[in-house]
């Protein structure tokens, strides 16, 4: 399967009554940047042999069309980062390795270095490297070293995209982070979706940053994120591939 994490898998569960297919989190992405698109042939093969029921990721059931490709986000972020002239502080889900590679790619293309901030970012980066990913990118630099680099030559990739109190982004915005200082004229890019329930604290964070003279860029005003979950058309495709038996709820 394809998702914003690496190497996701669906489960084919053989039961006495028949096969149950559990998709896990997934989407269809013809150009996922990191990893592979879903194995359509395998899904069709499972469908031909009969599927009693499918338990399917329906996070975006109310979103029409398709979720979009990571490659299109890369092109958009490259344009955005290319026009910004001061320090960039970017936050995303640490587990989204494709987005991480995208940010390293865009940083190199725009003459910037990357500094990872937050334990989860370092942990996922290390795990991805150990699994053979993130090989052809520039090396990240320590946040303490990044303080000596001019503002237009650095991008910080931080944890805390959902406004977590102890996340790096919140500490930076509160001016309590020991290594990253945010200044008037800098830009913060929220390259993630607001998880339902986090709206209030994130909008409060956005407002505080704007009040301090920081440019805030999010999916509400720029194209900076695609979901790791399927929209309706992708769910329809999966139903056609697998042909699970109709079930009345």
Report each predicted region and the residues it spans.
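Generic long, charged, amphipathic alpha-helical segments
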Residues: 213-228
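Conserved small/polar residues in nucleotide/adenosyl-binding loops
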Residues: 241-248
